[in-house]
Design a protein with these regions (language model features):
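Residues within the helices of the helix-turn-helix
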Residues: 10-11, 37
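Short amphipathic alpha-helical segments, especially helix-boundary/capping motifs
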Residues: 1, 10, 25-28
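Anionic, Ser/Thr-rich low-complexity intrinsically disordered regions
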Residues: 10, 47-51
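A detector for short, charged/polar N-terminal pre-domain segments
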Residues: 1-5, 63
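Short aromatic/basic micro-patch
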Residues: 7-8, 44
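Major-groove DNA-recognition helix of helix-turn-helix-type DNA-binding domains
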Residues: 16-44, 54, 60-67
């Protein structure tokens, strides 16, 4: 049972990503953004999905030896 995924609330995701709660709600309505689960009336996000979403926006700087 130790390998169960950690789930975050909408507020926790908002604080972690700096994406507003209204924006998260709009993304769900538009079926875009971070994958989520609806448990009755509660919305939960898997931590792994949130981290993957954040990583997908990562831009690696170009390394160049020419000046």
């Amino acid at each position: 049972m130790q390998n169960l995924p950690k789930y975050l609330t909408e507020r926790e995701v908002s604080e972690l990503t700096r994406i507003g709660m209204k924006t998260l709600q709009q993304h769900r309505w538009l079926k875009k953004g971070i994958a989520y689960s609806r448990l009755d009336r509660s919305i939960r996000y898997r931590l792994d999905d949130v981290l993957a979403f954040m990583e997908s926006g990562r831009i690696e700087p170009e390394t160049s030896n020419t000046h």
